[in-house]
From Swiss-Prot:
This is Teretoxin Tan14.1. Is 88% identical to As14a (AC P0C6S2). Belongs to the teretoxin N (TN) superfamily. The lineage of its organism: Eukaryota, Metazoa, Spiralia, Lophotrochozoa, Mollusca. It comes from Terebra anilis (Auger snail). The cysteine framework is XIV (C-C-C-C). Contains 2 disulfide bonds. Keywords: Cleavage on pair of basic residues, Disulfide bond, Secreted, Signal, Toxin. Residues 1-21 form the signal peptide.
């Protein structure tokens, strides 16, 4: 959750920076016969935005790879399952239903038992 908030904040800052640079570059008067200042800023901003977006996406993909998937041994509490305690099954179902898989109670109960 904290990673998503950081990524959202970074994306907002990047968009705000790009908008500010675009507004500032278009507000200056440009001499005839020279490269317009706005085109230079656009190419630099575009490059920076692309690099930043690639970095953010790679971090997000890396974080998703390290999260447990449905059916991963970390979902069920093995010590509770071996002793037959109901708490282990309840925890497994709870973890399954609150995961990103979006499974319902019956699917999670089938998987955990």
């Amino acid at each position: 959750m904290a990673l998503e908030a950081q990524m959202t904040l970074r994306m907002f800052v990047l968009v705000a920076m790009a908008s500010t640079v675009h507004v500032l570059s278009s507000s200056f008067s440009e001499d005839l016969g020279t490269v317009p200042l706005s085109k230079v800023f656009r190419s630099e901003t575009r490059f920076t935005l692309i690099q930043s977006l690639r970095a953010l996406l790679s971090r997000q993909l890396e974080a998703e790879v390290h999260q447990p998937e449905i059916g991963h041994p970390g979902f069920s509490d093995e010590t509770s399952s071996r002793t037959g305690k109901r708490g282990g099954l309840g925890r497994c179902i709870h973890n399954c239903m609150n995961s990103r898989g979006g499974l319902n109670f019956i699917q999670c109960k089938t998987m955990c038992s």
